[in-house]
Amino acid sequence: MKLVLATNNKGKVKELAELLKPCGYQVVSIGEFPGFTEVEEDGNTFADNAIKKALAAAEFTGELALADDSGLEVDALKGAPGVYSARFAGEPKDDTANNAKLLSLLEGVPQDHRTARFRCVIAIAEPNGRIHTAEGSCEGVILRELKGEGGFGYDPLFYVPEYKQTFAELDMEKKNSISHRGKALKKAMEILNRLYIHQEV
């Protein structure tokens, strides 16, 4: 049974495919379906965007589709960049520019006021239009400089005090066990397992 990931982000596809392996689905990217137009992420919340993307992918492919919207919420910036995390520094989306803008905005902010969290909402859309959602978050602190080579996005700036490493320094297995996406996906996998059993009957 196919599960379409409603993203062309290679880093995200790799991460999600690895996490979803145990579910028994054949995981494919929306990029394998020519003609699909990327959905504009214009929702006010992560849930709005995830649902919109999942529904569009399920409708286009006729398959079960999964989409996530996630981002960084920095307390000193009143929750920004939030839903604008991927395009914080404008279009085209650029991790380097986004990280530079974040560091610039937090210049002079003391370490104990640089608290932040990654939040993720996963939406699963059935071809009939039924929607299921799951959410996860991970608390951390924004560093003053990039650390680590792994991950993507804000990972090199997001420091997890409990592990004394940034998301970019953690190995994939450890990151997946504590990350916002990992936590949301754990809940989503329970939904997927129920749907899989239902389909097999």
Curated annotation (Swiss-Prot):
HAMAP family: Non_canon_purine_NTPase
Functional note: Pyrophosphatase that catalyzes the hydrolysis of nucleoside triphosphates to their monophosphate derivatives, with a high preference for the non-canonical purine nucleotides XTP (xanthosine triphosphate), dITP (deoxyinosine triphosphate) and ITP. Seems to function as a house-cleaning enzyme that removes non-canonical purine nucleotides from the nucleotide pool, thus preventing their incorporation into DNA/RNA and avoiding chromosomal lesions.
GO cellular component: cytosol
GO biological process: nucleotide metabolic process; purine nucleoside triphosphate catabolic process
Chain positions recorded as substrate binding sites: T7, N8, N9, K10, G11, K12, S70, F152, G153, Y154, D155, K175, H180, R181
EC number, as in UniProt: 3.6.1.66
Pfam families, per the entry: Ham1p_like (PF01725)
CDD domains referenced in this protein's UniProt entry, alphabetically: HAM1
This protein's name: dITP/XTP pyrophosphatase
Cofactors required: Mg(2+)
Catalysed reaction, written as an equation: XTP + H2O = XMP + diphosphate + H(+); dITP + H2O = dIMP + diphosphate + H(+); ITP + H2O = IMP + diphosphate + H(+)
Subunit details: Homodimer.
Keywords linked to the UniProt accession: Hydrolase, Magnesium, Metal-binding, Nucleotide metabolism, Nucleotide-binding
